[in-house]
Amino acid sequence: MSLFDLGGKTAIVTGAAGLLGRQHCQALAEAGAFVVATDSDRDTCAAVAEALGKSGIAIAADVTDPVSLRQLADAVRSLTGRIDVLVNNAAINDKFENPAAALEDSRFENYPLEMWKRSLEVNVTGVFLCSQVIGADMARAGRGSIINVASTYGVVAPDQSLYRDPEGRQRFYKTPVYPTTKGAVLAFTRFLAAYWGGAGVRVNALSPGGVENGQDDFFVAEYSRRTPLGRMAAPTDFRGAVVYLASDASGYMTGANLLVDGGFTAI
């Protein structure tokens, strides 16, 4: 079990205030790492760090701003002297403020260019910049693990029938940008793994399945029905995978995509 021990290591988690970001922070801290919880909102990431006690700290940063990320990296190195793990978790998953307009706005033919550009900026450029700024420090140190959080929708296309209620009415469509950006994250993961393999930095992706989080009952039931394990994921279901990818337990693993999806992509 010592292979999973992260004692003495420093981990940065972006999007730390999100549903899964909080879990990633907790898992890494429980494995012994000192965790830097990073989010664009200072107050929310401070609340995450507070829950970690002495095992973590909050430093707000904008993943789309290289100056902000350099300040983050410098602050972490000044504090702990090292960066061992980077979890690129920050991402946008489209939500439509007006439920009445969601169906039409989410159609591919109507999908707003502004939403497309914003998701590309955060979900793809954000991963690129965090890896470029923070990962470059890891490469210079000759060690590290980068974990890019992707999605099953980076592997398979969205099943639009999941968003259809029991009366057969399409509530909305899963939009094109989330699968596109998560597919890009997987390609970028392979690129970076090959590029930094000789520098001692491992780069892997973690692709979570759908997480139960207050969705309509019909969606939860239908998603569970088409998943071999018969349920959606709980937010805690990815803790072990994050620790595994961050630790020496996955020491001969790079350029891989670890699917933790209850078998969703197996059928």
Each model region followed by its residue ranges:
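Active-site helix of classical SDR
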Residues: 131, 181-184, 189
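C-terminal substrate-recognition "lid" of short-chain dehydrogenase/reductases
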Residues: 128, 143, 231-266
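Conserved glycine-rich Rossmann-like NAD(P)H-binding loop of the short-chain dehydrogenase/reductase
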Residues: 33-47
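Substrate-binding pocket helix/loop in short-chain dehydrogenase/reductase
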Residues: 97-108, 112-117, 160, 223
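The beta1-alpha1 cofactor-binding region of Rossmann-like NAD(H)/NADP(H)-dependent oxidoreductases
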Residues: 42-43, 60-72, 113, 237
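Short, small/polar-rich loop/turn modules that mediate ligand/substrate recognition or access, typified
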Residues: 197, 202, 253-255
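Canonical Rossmann dinucleotide-binding motif of NAD(H)/NADP(H)-dependent dehydrogenases/reductases
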Residues: 3-36, 192
